[in-house]
Design a protein with these regions (language model features):
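GHKL/Bergerat-fold ATPase module in large chromosome/replication-associated machines
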Residues: 41, 52-61
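Active-site-proximal polar cores
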Residues: 133-134
């Protein structure tokens, strides 16, 4: 009864509401139903890889599952006699967006907005059983390893989970050519919330970003950009980071003095930028202290004249209120070359990367009285 069924739905709708307004709706979803043994495929293949092909038969003539004192697990038994599990997983993704041209204000100007939903959920149930393996001896008796157990009557819930993310962004763009001058600008505001079962509150992100690109006569290119990003992982006053970048390029092959036929394209470029990282692997809200309680069975103290036992508390994590974004600075310079009618391409890059506010795990000595999860910053 091993099977896998998958049901998909997908829809993409694009509509030109007016000459200047475009809207779209994208929908994708799927349902997956799986029936499988209680033994995982990795466990089955691990056993297969350790058993010699001639170590034992699969089963004996009387149907008993074969095994030995050395190989007490049988791949056939793992597949057919450990019970079963049923999994159902669901995925739904929806995105709606609208784009409005504002040529009535100035040519090349436009605004846009997008909302998105991305959700997954899963539910698994199963029943368990077990099997014994038998080793035939010279006197036609069996040595038995393990125990046969019938399929359980009760169905067990193996897992039940869900998570979903809501995202929104809105912004504007400007794209226009004035003779030999090309100008492109873009800016947006964005925010997202990730809701995970068992975690409260949601993971929240918010920020703005933008860029401005200028090109003169398809020879000289410059670009500046920025991101002002925020995360609820850090304390107020440290939640936002500013990450700028600047880049420039000289396309020498478009110069009038460049007439080398062997080289079709030649560009020199350089850039500097900063990138932020807030996914550091620490527990949530590491800027806050974390206290845990314990009762009489695991600690506490006697207080008062009545010798009454009181529960206790201990600090399980030392906070670091100064935690903020990890930032990586990058310097890059390079050259791009195309030869022989673009049949050969050569790219050379040199770069330097430096990370500041590097987030590291801080170890504490035993006399501190806590294992701690304090996060230290380093350059």
């Amino acid at each position: 009864n091993v099977n896998y069924n998958r049901y998909n739905i997908r829809s993409n709708i694009d509509a030109a509401v007016t000459k200047s307004l475009d809207v779209s709706l994208d929908l994708a979803g799927r349902i997956e139903d799986k029936n499988m043994p209680n033994s995982t495929s990795s466990d089955i293949f691990n056993v297969l890889s350790t058993i010699a092909p001639n170590a034992m038969p699969i089963t004996y003539e009387d149907g008993k599952i074969a095994g030995t004192s050395q190989y007490r697990q049988n791949p056939y038994g793992m597949i057919s006699h450990t019970g079963y599990r049923k999994d159902r997983n669901k995925v739904l993704q929806v995105k709606a967006q609208a784009k409005q041209k504002l040529d009535i204000v100035t040519k090349g100007l436009g605004v846009r907005a997008m909302v998105a939903f991305d959700g997954v959920s899963g539910y698994g149930t199963g029943k368990t059983s077990n099997y014994a393996t038998y080793e035939l001896q010279r006197d036609n008796t069996y040595s038995v390893y393990g125990e046969d157990k019938q399929l359980s009557l009760a169905q067990e819930k193996l897992y039940d989970y869900y998570q979903y993310q809501l995202a929104f962004n809105a912004g504007f763009s400007y794209d226009r050519i004035f003779g030999k001058h090309e100008v492109y600008a873009d800016a947006r505001y964005y925010q997202s919330q990730l809701f995970v079962q068992g975690d409260n509150p949601a993971y929240a992100r918010q920020g703005v970003d933008g860029k401005l690109t200028y090109c003169f006569d398809k020879r000289y290119v410059g670009e500046i950009s920025f991101a002002y990003d925020g995360s609820d992982e850090y304390a107020p006053g440290h939640r936002f980071g500013f990450f700028p970048s600047i880049a420039g390029a000289w396309i020498i092959s478009n110069e009038s003095f460049f007439n080398t036929k062997a080289v079709n394209y030649l560009k020199l470029r350089a850039s500097y930028g900063e990138a932020g990282n807030c996914k550091t692997g620490f527990d949530r809200y590491a800027y806050q202290s974390h206290w845990s309680g314990f009762d009489q069975s695991s600690g506490g103290y006697i207080f008062g004249s009545g010798f009454a036992w009181s529960d206790g508390a201990w600090e399980g994590r030392l906070p670091n209120p100064d935690l903020t974004w990890e930032s990586t600075r990058s310097w890059n310079a390079g050259i791009d070359l195309n030869f022989f009618n673009n049949r050969v391409e050569f790219i050379l890059d040199a770069y330097i990367k430096k990370t500041r506010n590097l987030l590291l795990q801080q170890d504490y000595p035993g006399y501190m009285g806590t294992t701690g999860n304090g996060a230290a910053t380093a350059q």
